[in-house]
């Protein structure tokens, strides 16, 4: 599953451009795939799945993120941080990734690549809190997802 790191990068760029430019995510996906010259079918399909999931659940994803920002609104986040968190929540919570450690590493690496180390630590902290609340909390009472 080595292709997934590249797929995450592709999906991140699509979400980033969608947030920044407000254009059709499907068209942006085609644009990024062409720019990156993606030939690997698995990478293409996984990136598409990530983008489709994030776009389909964007309101819920933003609500989940907002609950864990502690005094911040999602609109105050930079484009890199906001869209890295969206991608992470889509994959960890909605797609229920079987490799959460790898997702965390790749998401934080994306933030460091496109922003900086401090932003990477911030995203890691917020994503960890979300993951703990939705996945690793005891089975007593987890926050619910409307789409389930």
From Swiss-Prot:
Gene3D superfamilies per UniProt: NusB-like
Highest taxon in the source lineage: Bacteria
GO molecular function, one term: RNA binding
CC per GO annotation: cytosol
Coiled coil: none
GO biological process: DNA-templated transcription termination; transcription antitermination
Pfam families (alphabetical): NusB (PF01029)
Keyword terms of this UniProt record: RNA-binding, Transcription, Transcription antitermination, Transcription regulation
The protein's role, per its UniProt record: Involved in transcription antitermination. Required for transcription of ribosomal RNA (rRNA) genes. Binds specifically to the boxA antiterminator sequence of the ribosomal RNA (rrn) operons.
NCBIfam families linked to this entry: nusB
Protein family according to the UniProt entry: Belongs to the NusB family.
Protein name, as recorded: Transcription antitermination protein NusB
């Amino acid at each position: 599953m080595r292709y997934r790191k590249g797929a995450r990068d592709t999906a991140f760029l699509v979400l980033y451009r969608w947030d920044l430019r407000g254009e059709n995510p499907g068209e942006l996906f085609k644009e990024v795939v062409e720019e990156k010259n993606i030939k690997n079918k698995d990478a293409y399909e996984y990136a598409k799945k990530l983008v489709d999931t994030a776009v389909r659940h964007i309101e819920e994803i933003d609500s989940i993120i907002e609950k864990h920002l502690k005094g911040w609104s999602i609109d105050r986040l930079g484009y890199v941080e906001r869209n890295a968190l969206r991608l992470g929540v889509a994959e960890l919570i909605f797609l229920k990734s079987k490799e959460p450690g790898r997702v965390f590493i790749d998401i934080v690496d994306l933030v460091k690549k496109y922003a900086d180390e401090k932003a990477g630590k911030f995203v890691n902290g917020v994503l960890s809190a979300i993951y703990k609340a939705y996945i690793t909390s005891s089975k007593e009472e987890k926050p619910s997802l409307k789409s389930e």
